[in-house]
Amino acid sequence: MSTTVNVDSLAEYEKSQIKRALELGTVMTVFSFRKSTPERRTVQVIMETRQVAWSKTADKIEGFLDIMEIKEIRPGKNSKDFERAKAVRQKEDCCFTILYGTQFVLSTLSLAADSKEDAVNWLSGLKILHQEAMNASTPTIIESWLRKQIYSVDQTRRNSISLRELKTILPLINFKVSSAKFLKDKFVEIGAHKDELSFEQFHLFYKKLMFEQQKSILDEFKKDSSVFILGNTDRPDASAVYLHDFQRFLIHEQQEHWAQDLNKVRERMTKFIDDTMRETAEPFLFVDEFLTYLFSRENSIWDEKYDAVDMQDMNNPLSHYWISSSHNTYLTGDQLRSESSPEAYIRCLRMGCRCIELDCWDGPDGKPVIYHGWTRTTKIKFDDVVQAIKDHAFVTSSFPVILSIEEHCSVEQQRHMAKAFKEVFGDLLLTKPTEASADQLPSPSQLREKIIIKHKKLGPRGDVDVNMEDKKDEHKQQGELYMWDSIDQKWTRHYCAIADAKLSFSDDIEQTMEEEVPQDIPPTELHFGEKWFHKKVEKRTSAEKLLQEYCMETGGKDGTFLVRESETFPNDYTLSFWRSGRVQHCRIRSTMEGGTLKYYLTDNLTFSSIYALIQHYRETHLRCAEFELRLTDPVPNPNPHESKPWYYDSLSRGEAEDMLMRIPRDGAFLIRKREGSDSYAITFRARGKVKHCRINRDGRHFVLGTSAYFESLVELVSYYEKHSLYRKMRLRYPVTPELLERYNMERDINSLYDVSRMYVDPSEINPSMPQRTVKALYDYKAKRSDELSFCRGALIHNVSKEPGGWWKGDYGTRIQQYFPSNYVEDISTADFEELEKQIIEDNPLGSLCRGILDLNTYNVVKAPQGKNQKSFVFILEPKQQGDPPVEFATDRVEELFEWFQSIREITWKIDTKENNMKYWEKNQSIAIELSDLVVYCKPTSKTKDNLENPDFREIRSFVETKADSIIRQKPVDLLKYNQKGLTRVYPKGQRVDSSNYDPFRLWLCGSQMVALNFQTADKYMQMNHALFSLNGRTGYVLQPESMRTEKYDPMPPESQRKILMTLTVKVLGARHLPKLGRSIACPFVEVEICGAEYDNNKFKTTVVNDNGLSPIWAPTQEKVTFEIYDPNLAFLRFVVYEEDMFSDPNFLAHATYPIKAVKSGFRSVPLKNGYSEDIELASLLVFCEMRPVLESEEELYSSCRQLRRRQEELNNQLFLYDTHQNLRNANRDALVKEFSVNENQLQLYQEKCNKRLREKRVSNSKFYS
């Protein structure tokens, strides 16, 4: 964090004064790029929750941010928020911006104080508070988190919480309350007064809840193998862990060297003691406090020694390091339409990235711009980017930054680039070699705080080394076009691209962004969509019954209300509300004022709509002679769905399926009442298939799945119109008779939207593979006679997915026997995903593609008069009779000409290769001034496939597909080249969604700059973050010395591989998992070894239903042992998924670590979101044990591997005999016999391996005790 104030020099009393001023609050001006006029707000720090809040009035907070999420505090007017209000004069030294968040794109709070003193106080105070928040102990963070929960239901910051409020909070924090009695019993147990908990009681409730849910984990410390034996764990204070027991646990089980110092152990224990009376020379932890310690970040699996920079490792040549590298750094989203921003450069540099990319194009006023050429990504000023790099390059890391320049500028604008580099960077810019006579690259230490330019360089004769093959596909037609939808009779906007004589198009852009477009609803109709509006209620008593039932369930808050149409007076309404334990009614009258209908409760205050009247009295008290009251909770209308076009009261499942099958668009849906029950079903279309999901009633709520609660079906539909219901599908097309009629009229056009033309069903590719086949992820030994035993990699056929986590299947000679579902993965799903990947491999729109037109089958013509209210239209007319024409439109005549010409060249078979060559020839001039700035990173293309005799001053860039080809053919040659020269690898152009490729094999072959899309939250970016967490997050990680030995082979044959380590993992439990959508999480954990292909392996736990707050897998979860060949180049990865109502996994959180940085013992695994940002208090508890494999044991492990491979072959051969009757069965008996012998031998070998691990552990525990 960067400020102009050195807070470390402040005395403690000065820090306290500053914090007190921030707590009292300051009136400041808030700027936002979304608003043209700045606003005055009171900004203050809420110390109890560690949040910055801003408000217009004292009783209503408008917004807040968590201090722990602050990434930067930037002095001055250095954010785009200030740009819209340039007319407002604010002094530079009074302004500052807080950048915060847990996504790649950060949020901003831009403020202007009234004085420089106030601004300095806030800059200093926020830095102090951020340091304190980042260093806070886990118990302190828990207390702050509990305060947030109380304040979330009442902003007055009272010190208590009611039973009704607690019932509301628990589902929001991922815990399902089993019954109302459960909470009431807990209140009695804690000693609550009148259904109200004080904060201290709420804290006690939390501690009891977490302990009771997870106390079985402590059974691990009652075993003989434990280094100390724990006593009774029935209650949180039933027994204790004493000082010397805790020290023994830390030294022998956790292998913490610092624990030799008893004072440090005492200090660690004191942080977790919830009673100052026990903070003595001989402290002890109650068992619930010990359990909290196990889950805490103080007990993290991460070895904190890697947080420091190892300066001894920073003196090798640059080519010996992996260097954190970004692709198209300026982008904040996809490669086609997203925003470019200097903030993306700042974010990457502050994340430790050391190689960033600048895509430079000619801009106005002779100054370049940066954007992704020939796309709709926004343009940013080159000069702004250079200044941002200068300001932030060395904040996180002092080691060199490489600027990879993608050059598209004219010579004149290149000269401006060179000038800007020299003027802005000054001495930071590297302009000459560090050593004139060197024969290798300099080290990171030698290049400290230097900026290196990677750019084409003029040769001795002024020539440029450029390979035309690299550019041949770059100049292609792409952009936005309108397509005429003859079914909906409207133009829809799509992103389109031409490649290989095919036109690919994306989803309708308006539909992908529709939630951002506000609907234009007349003010007089605004109340129609509100849940408090009940239209006509048959009788006054019916309204009273609704209110009474709602208040009985929720606790009866005064002001609970509903609005209904008046039974007696036309245009009037009735307000019914709850006060002092009974229902009262008020008439909302109407009157004409100046020709406009107005509504009122009191004569002196009228409103233009019912909505405005209700909103007013929800914020302001309604005052009458007898009472004063503000409207609070709305009573939802129980049946608003009955008037909706998507609802069917009497429709069978078969009729619903028939209707959906006639509408070939994903997102089509209807809801129907199920026959003979008080439940409903939603029927929808997704991925070309019709699916159903039951909607149950729970009191007044509608429940989708097991824990997604909605007040009404209307609310359910509204929610899933904005959020994904299944995979990425949102509800889009209500199935109505009118929609069915339109589709029946236009059947031919359906083929355009039929994704099956683009994706092939897996069964068509491999029909011999049964649809219900799974692959074993790990060995399993049967514990009962009706269970299967199998080895890792086994294929289990004819699987029946039974409920309860146990499936049935066929393996070898065992037919329809049980096995645990978490030991396998469904290979039909994996095959389908791989198939999708293969089919979109060469598509210019990648995964965004939703349709393809083969231009060779069409003729292109213009529509001179335009069509359907569009002026610039061209039509693809099919050459084959009977196919429908496809109509396109553009906004400008120039765009129409470009698209028409591009398509006509294809349809007329014009070879454009010569034109492309001329285009690039014309654009290859290099400014001498820019060429002179290139010292070490000179790109070479003409000879880059030749990996012999590397020149350390050159760099070779490969697209991922080319790099993959080199690795398959000559991995050792690439490794040896990288020992002296540099390589940079970047994503293929088809990754328009900014997805990433697997970087591991490239790292394995020594590629230094493996450029990824930092803005994308995916597995490979998470692995990248894990790798560069090493060495103090400098962005430079020294490759293992073994990679530079003569005999090292990155892809060794199987005969040369040796297991060097076994890693045993057991997942015990989790806390505070994040919540997706409306449902309470049903989590499971996938544990994976990521590395070379021969190291890759994974394991899944079972699913825990409806508990994301405190799920456990102990004591039933077994330990899993992974065999690792190369621990220096492998990662341990934990991914937490939730299983949704369709049994699909959805990502919740992850934690990925280089195995060398993993600690042994019972360890907390702090969890991160997709962007590798910490999730408050979220963690796993695991047992982890690493053991080197001795030479004498290698033969045993080798025998296991050979037997596993043979068992896979035998199982597949047996399956062929059993499924193909025409095969001769002469050899079947011999196969069965060999299979049985091998299976027994494999189990024997595996038991020997496990026995050795157990013996070592038991002998160790006896020694320690």
From Swiss-Prot:
Instruction: List the GO biological process terms.
Output: antifungal innate immune response; B cell activation; B cell differentiation; B cell receptor signaling pathway; calcium-mediated signaling; cell activation; cellular response to calcium ion; cellular response to lectin
> Where does it localize?
Membrane raft
- Describe the processing and modification events after translation: Phosphorylated on tyrosine residues by CSF1R. Phosphorylated on tyrosine residues by BTK and SYK; upon ligand-induced activation of a variety of growth factor receptors and immune system receptors. Phosphorylation leads to increased phospholipase activity.
- Describe the reaction catalysed, as an equation: a 1,2-diacyl-sn-glycero-3-phospho-(1D-myo-inositol-4,5-bisphosphate) + H2O = 1D-myo-inositol 1,4,5-trisphosphate + a 1,2-diacyl-sn-glycerol + H(+)
Query: GO molecular function: any one?
Result: phospholipase C activity
Q: Where is the PI-PLC Y-box domain?
A: 930-1044
Annotated ranges, domain PI-PLC X-box: 312-456
Read off the Gene3D superfamilies from this record: C2 domain, Phosphatidylinositol (PI) phosphodiesterase, Pleckstrin-homology domain (PH domain)/Phosphotyrosine-binding domain (PTB), SH2 domain, SH3 Domains
Q: Does the keyword Membrane apply?
A: yes
Q: Does the keyword Lipid metabolism apply?
A: yes
What domain of life does the native source organism fall in?
Eukaryota
Q: What does the entry list under GO cellular component?
A: cytoplasm; cytosol; extracellular exosome; intracellular vesicle; membrane raft; perinuclear region of cytoplasm; plasma membrane; ruffle membrane
Q: Please give the InterPro entries that the UniProt record associates with this protein.
A: C2_dom, C2_domain_sf, EF-hand-dom_pair, PH-like_dom_sf, PH_domain, PI-PLC_fam, PLC-gamma, PLC-gamma_C-SH2
> Keywords in UniProt for this one?
Calcium, Disease variant, Hydrolase, Lipid degradation, Lipid metabolism, Membrane, Phosphoprotein, Repeat, SH2 domain, SH3 domain, Transducer
All copies of the SH2 domain together span 532-635, 646-735
Q: Which residues form the C2 domain?
A: 1038-1169
All copies of domain PH, residue ranges:
20-131
First-listed, main subcellular location of the protein, grouped into a coarse class: membrane
Job description of the protein: The production of the second messenger molecules diacylglycerol (DAG) and inositol 1,4,5-trisphosphate (IP3) is mediated by activated phosphatidylinositol-specific phospholipase C enzymes. It is a crucial enzyme in transmembrane signaling.
Q: Which disease is it linked to?
A: Familial cold autoinflammatory syndrome 3: An autosomal dominant immune disorder characterized by the development of cutaneous urticaria, erythema, and pruritis in response to cold exposure. Affected individuals have variable additional immunologic defects, including antibody deficiency, decreased numbers of B-cells, defective B-cells, increased susceptibility to infection, and increased risk of autoimmune disorders. Autoinflammation, antibody deficiency, and immune dysregulation: An autosomal dominant systemic disorder characterized by recurrent blistering skin lesions with a dense inflammatory infiltrate and variable involvement of other tissues, including joints, the eye, and the gastrointestinal tract. Affected individuals have a mild humoral immune deficiency associated with recurrent sinopulmonary infections, but no evidence of circulating autoantibodies.
Could you tell me which PANTHER family the record lists for this protein?
1-PHOSPHATIDYLINOSITOL 4,5-BISPHOSPHATE PHOSPHODIESTERASE GAMMA-2, PHOSPHOINOSITIDE-SPECIFIC PHOSPHOLIPASE C FAMILY PROTEIN
The protein's name: 1-phosphatidylinositol 4,5-bisphosphate phosphodiesterase gamma-2
Q: Which organism is it from?
A: Homo sapiens (Human)
What is this organism's lineage? Eukaryota, Metazoa, Chordata, Craniata, Vertebrata
Q: Which gene encodes it?
A: PLCG2
